[in-house]
């Protein structure tokens, strides 16, 4: 039976400033930590990425043509405040006004994120969000944007607080490249959630028009053997690190007893102490019912086994399937040998995990109000067919179809899901994979910056027109 999606459903495409804009030092933009980190550690940089800074009219014209009626955009904090605070860069402000005007001209609603992995370098060097001064600077930046850009109706504070702490302090693949420091992971999560809560409260108290929420990456965690208590415990602890800790902060305004028990266990095994003040709890509590929506980024699920050794993570950055290892002291290890398809980057393709995660939010956090799936898509080594000027990305179509089907199921089962944003609108730069891993509806020739609609773009157009998942 063909499933359908609601008439008012957003069929969106997602981007991020650093991954799409290029122009990393153009028109007064300040440096971000990634600029230096990529120069020192990788064979690629974010220059020119997809040159969205100059080519956004092309991408938005394509969006309109192919039925994309929403776009996730992030503002580069360092384009507005090159140092993260202090002097405003007027050319950066002008750019975003022009970008948002073009969105509305093309009938593509902008959903705008304030922070997408790109803290200005000056603040990042000073501890990023581990330094509580950065919370203050972020809230000031948020307030400036709320006042300056009234044309924006949908705001999100942060993109993926979980993977920021994870990437910076656990896996070590984001600057500053620290590994296995659980104290920093949880402190980063917490401090960023305080920053989120303060910005949301400010938005509501200021009477700004529009809606505000946050985007969380929520990979579902399962025990490899549900009858083995060690595997069950490993899945619970891994879920606390990546999901439950930040969801509790968002919607409970505190951390549940089970969450804190898990955090204390992990810190007791690995060393470290979490600094949470009474004022922090008051801030979280004041904002817990004020989020207008939750953005869920979902790509994969993980299966966990009990584990009794030291932490060791091998990150698959090359797309050579089977190159991943992930085991954490006091937590557990991910089992990759499961009967589930996976991508070349060892990401488990499991649409049921998205359904389970949506329904978990509905059940455990009934004050969620509404959900957008703000990222979901398939990273692929796309093969461009020169004679046809396209990509036959049937695997991507199949991936998206499967995930939209479970979204339709979740809606039937009572979840208020209002839209879906494919990652990504066009091919963009990938943080730890460079330019090989492509996700877009539109193929980008990174040499010429020409755009070519893939087969998936035509499929998505029909989906947006008919609302039928075929």
Curated annotation (Swiss-Prot):
Record keyword Hydrolase present: yes
GO terms for cellular component: cytosol
Catalysed reactions listed for this entry: a 6-phospho-beta-D-galactoside + H2O = D-galactose 6-phosphate + an alcohol
UniProt keyword annotations, A-Z: Glycosidase, Hydrolase
Family designation: Belongs to the glycosyl hydrolase 1 family.
PANTHER family documented for this protein: GLYCOSYL HYDROLASE, LP05116P
Protein name per Swiss-Prot or TrEMBL: 6-phospho-beta-galactosidase
């Amino acid at each position: 039976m063909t499933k359908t999606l609601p008439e008012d459903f957003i069929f969106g495409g997602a981007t991020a400033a650093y991954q799409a804009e290029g122009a990393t030092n153009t028109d007064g933009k300040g440096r971000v930590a990634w600029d230096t980190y990529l120069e020192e550690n990788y064979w690629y940089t974010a220059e020119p990425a997809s040159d969205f800074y100059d080519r956004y009219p092309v991408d938005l014209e394509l969006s309109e043509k192919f039925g994309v009626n929403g776009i996730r955009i992030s503002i580069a904090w360092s384009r507005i405040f090159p140092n993260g605070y202090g002097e405003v860069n007027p050319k950066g402000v002008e750019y975003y006004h022009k970008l948002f005007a073009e969105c509305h001209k093309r009938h593509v609603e902008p959903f705008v994120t304030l922070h997408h992995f790109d803290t200005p370098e000056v603040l990042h060097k000073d501890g990023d969000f581990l330094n509580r001064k950065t919370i203050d600077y972020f809230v000031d930046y948020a307030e400036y944007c709320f006042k300056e850009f009234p044309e924006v109706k949908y705001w999100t504070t942060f993109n993926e607080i979980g993977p920021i702490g994870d990437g910076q302090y656990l896996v070590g693949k984001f600057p500053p490249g620290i590994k296995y420091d659980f104290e920093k992971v949880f402190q980063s999560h917490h401090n960023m959630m305080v920053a989120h809560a303060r910005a949301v409260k400010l938005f509501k108290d200021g009477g700004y028009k529009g809606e505000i929420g946050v985007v969380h990456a929520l990979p579902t965690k399962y025990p490899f053997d549900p009858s083995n208590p060690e595997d069950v415990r490993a899945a619970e602890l891994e879920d606390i690190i990546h999901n439950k800790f930040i969801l509790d902060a968002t919607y409970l305004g505190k951390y549940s007893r089970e969450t804190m028990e898990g955090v204390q266990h992990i810190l007791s095994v690995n060393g470290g102490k979490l600094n949470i003040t009474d004022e922090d709890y008051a801030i979280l509590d004041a904002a817990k019912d004020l989020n207008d929506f939750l953005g869920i980024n979902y790509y994969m699920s993980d299966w966990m086994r009990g584990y009794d050794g030291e932490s060791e993570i091998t990150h698959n950055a090359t797309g050579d399937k089977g190159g991943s290892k992930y085991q954490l002291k006091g937590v557990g290890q991910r089992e990759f040998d499961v009967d589930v398809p996976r991508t070349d980057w060892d990401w488990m393709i499991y649409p049921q995990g998205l359904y389970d995660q949506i329904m978990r939010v509905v059940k455990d956090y009934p004050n969620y109000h509404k959900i957008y799936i703000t990222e979901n898509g398939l990273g692929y080594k796309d093969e461009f067919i020169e004679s046809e000027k396209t990509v036959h990305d049937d695997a991507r179509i199949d991936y998206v179809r499967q995930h939209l089907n479970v979204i339709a199921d979740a809606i039937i089962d009572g979840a208020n899901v209002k839209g879906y944003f494919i990652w990504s609108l066009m091919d963009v730069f990938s943080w730890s994979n460079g330019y090989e891993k492509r996700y877009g509806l539109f193929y980008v020739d990174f040499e010429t910056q020409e755009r070519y609609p893939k087969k998936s773009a035509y499929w998505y157009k029909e989906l947006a027109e008919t609302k039928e998942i075929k």
